[in-house]
């Protein structure tokens, strides 16, 4: 479902998110979505290959999407966790596995390597 607004940043939720990203400048944006059951990634850095049982499967970057804005235009990595179902959360053990994998990836890619283009510490 892609229901774009009438113009870029015309929707209040988009305006809010844009302001937060512009002010805070996060090192990583994590988006939770459904229903593809994959891991998506946009932006700099080598992407995580998996989070829990979700495997990397880049679904593409769409103009106006969070991945396009954050990952392509702003250079902020965007990890999108695509759950299997919008109304059914994974079990606690699976959620823990996803977060553990994400934290390991962040430690290597964001903390040790630093921003893209910088030398490793």
Can you name each region flagged by the protein language model?
Residues 1-60, 68, 90:
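Active-site/substrate-binding loop(s) of hydrolase catalytic cores
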Residues 39-42, 48-50, 60-120:
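Active-site-adjacent mobile loop/cap segments within catalytic or ligand-binding domains
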């Amino acid at each position: 479902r892609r229901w774009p607004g009438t113009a870029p940043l015309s929707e209040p939720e988009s305006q809010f998110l844009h302001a937060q990203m512009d002010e805070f400048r996060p090192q990583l944006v994590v988006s939770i979505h459904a229903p593809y059951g994959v891991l998506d990634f946009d932006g700099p850095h080598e992407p995580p290959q998996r989070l829990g049982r979700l495997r990397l499967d880049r679904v593409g970057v769409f103009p106006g999407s969070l991945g396009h804005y954050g990952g392509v235009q702003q250079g902020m990595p965007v990890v999108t966790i695509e759950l299997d179902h919008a109304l059914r959360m994974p079990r606690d053990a699976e959620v823990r596995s996803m977060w553990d994998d994400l934290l390991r990836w962040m430690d290597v890619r964001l903390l040790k390597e630093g921003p893209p283009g910088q030398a490793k510490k």
